[in-house]
Amino acid sequence: VDAGLIIHESRFTYQRTGLVSVIDLGDWWEQTTGHAIPLGAILARRDLDDTAAQHVNDAIRASLALARRDEAKIIGYVREHAFEMEDDVMRKHIGLYVNEFSDDLGDVGVAAIDDLFARAHAAGYIPENKPEFVPES
């Protein structure tokens, strides 16, 4: 069977090349677990003090806020690193992955990450581990 994993902006354009979706892993995760899909994370070492971790967290939030206020300032950078060059595809990609969870995981996001860790541990991929989150400022 010829198969592949479609990621990033290509999830919006793969049909143009004649590819067919067998399963959308995001949909599968949400239907199987009942949780949002935890797509990525920004991590800090546990020995980093809370103040330093909070500074990083605040800087990321400020960056996201700036990007939302003036999309024109970031579109050139995004275009340089995008797999698909069409503006509408890039905007869909950003809108899908830079969302309310980017600013604040909330209980929904924390539950998704906790479930991911529990499943990874149960499958033998990681030792038992509970993620810690940077306290809100």
What is each residue range found by the language model?
Residues V1-E80:
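Pocket-lining segment of extracytoplasmic ligand-binding domains
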Residues E30-P38, I113-G124:
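Short secondary-structure transition/capping segments
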Residues A44, D50, D103, E128, ...:
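Generic structural "secondary-structure junction" signal
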Residues D49-R119:
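Secondary-structure end/capping motifs
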Residues A118-S137:
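Conserved C-terminal helix/tail region of periplasmic/extracytoplasmic solute-binding proteins
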